[in-house]
Amino acid sequence: MNLKQEVESRKTFAIISHPDAGKTTLTEKLLYFSGAIREAGTVKGKKTGKFATSDWMKVEQERGISVTSSVMQFDYDDYKINILDTPGHEDFSEDTYRTLMAVDSAVMVIDCAKGIEPQTLKLFKVCKMRGIPIFTFINKLDRVGKEPFELLDEIEETLNIETYPMNWPIGMGQSFFGIIDRKSKTIEPFRDEENILHLNDDFELEEDHAITNDSDFEQAIEELMLVEEAGEAFDNDALLSGDLTPVFFGSALANFGVQNFLNAYVDFAPMPNARQTKEDVEVSPFDDSFSGFIFKIQANMDPKHRDRIAFMRVVSGAFERGMDVTLQRTNKKQKITRSTSFMADDKETVNHAVAGDIIGLYDTGNYQIGDTLVGGKQTYSFQDLPQFTPEIFMKVSAKNVMKQKHFHKGIEQLVQEGAIQYYKTLHTNQIILGAVGQLQFEVFEHRMKNEYNVDVVMEPVGRKIARWIENEDQITDKMNTSRSILVKDRYDDLVFLFENEFATRWFEEKFPEIKLYSLL
């Protein structure tokens, strides 16, 4: 297989949703249907000791939530699929945001009873902004929920995107019979004891079956005929531009509708895209010269070895283990001898990868999120990955002063992961951590104790707003007021932490010559 054929066989996507919509369950079932795992265990099965394949971190297994982005690769038909299961909890939107920079499409999971929820909306907007094609899986049809047309209208009106239902449900909840596949005109029954049924071109059942007298069946056929009469053909170009989403109905927990979705996904999802550089150069996935970027760093995937893995998206060319690459930020050459692929925490050495693949590089502290790696004589760097402005700030210290070495090591690694943001006061070197939400601090505290054996003391700073400074050379000590703290971030850039909006406006009016700005 040549490079072009290899690249065309790659499909790389992220799964996005609000917490509890069934995102991680869908991930498990996709792995199950691909043969990557033998048993699709239930995500919530804490009492049985079974945890989702993608929820590998101890805190995730205990709480049943995804707080990091897991990466898994599997083969299906003639395709190699890279799937990223992202954090559903809003406090970890920064990690999710960066993950969405590394994929070529996204799958949006919606709970049929709840419809579009706040976190789904937020993540959808990121996909829309990037023009990422979005596939929609409406989940939990075996429970009572909103009517199909109501859900489609909600998606179209709330998200401003056209919908195209690929299948249609017959009933829901206890009366859920199955789904009608529009393309094959077949009915796939929900219960195993039922056989697949066939419809003719007029949507009449070809077999004798009691369901013809069922009101749910009659309603489903009427609704589907309305959809067909609208006469809109599936527009693949609109999908690829992010203007149309194909919609699939099913139940991930019951393994129903998942394989239909997977079959359609590999048919319609895009192959790896070209990427833009800071130098305004478009890098084609078919370029012979290797390039990639780091979008995530994860410490302690193997707690026994205190390892650090940098997750790299291959953008162009072929990666070969042992090859020499240049880290563009430092302009230093390095030989990559340790590279890995993933099934959550199960790792396997990677000798070869092409555009679209996600691989892990063992990191001794060389890499930062957003780093560009290139082979040959290339000199470009890919565009920076986004960083969120924190909204909560805490002073942090080690409870036991004898644990300072472990304390600083833990903070250094967790900050480099992008799990939390780091600041230091100018004169006292007091460490202040910033986060988007409270759960980030809870996970930080948990990981410091479990992974670094350090109990930490955290104390609110009483500051809510962070503003960076364009013209740092004009900052003086007199600008540090009782309602603000001047600190440095991990890159040694000056940052003001303000008490509230009023304090921010007061500062801007008193010192108009200082140009403040926020991150995302």
UniProtKB/Swiss-Prot annotation:
tr-type G domain residues: 8-277
Cytoplasm in keyword set: yes
UniProt subcellular location: Cytoplasm
Chief localization: cytoplasm
One annotated GO molecular function: translation release factor activity, codon specific
Keywords: Cytoplasm, GTP-binding, Nucleotide-binding, Protein biosynthesis
Superkingdom, natural source: Bacteria
Keyword Cytoplasm: yes
Pfam families with a match to the protein in the record: EF-G_D2, GTP_EFTU, RF3_C
PROSITE patterns assigned: G_TR_1 (PS00301), G_TR_2 (PS51722)
Intrachain disulfide bonds: none
GO BP annotations, alphabetical order: regulation of translational termination; translational termination
InterPro entries for the chain: EF-G-like_DII, EFG_III/V, G_TR_CS, P-loop_NTPase, PrfC, RF3_C, RF3_dom_3_sf, RF3_GTP-bd
GO cellular component term of the entry, any: cytosol
Summary of the function given for this chain in its UniProt record: Increases the formation of ribosomal termination complexes and stimulates activities of RF-1 and RF-2. It binds guanine nucleotides and has strong preference for UGA stop codons. It may interact directly with the ribosome. The stimulation of RF-1 and RF-2 is significantly reduced by GTP and GDP, but not by GMP.
HAMAP family, alphabetized: Rel_fac_3 (MF_00072)
Family: Belongs to the TRAFAC class translation factor GTPase superfamily. Classic translation factor GTPase family. PrfC subfamily.
Protein name: Peptide chain release factor 3
Taxonomic lineage: Bacteria, Bacillati, Bacillota, Bacilli, Bacillales
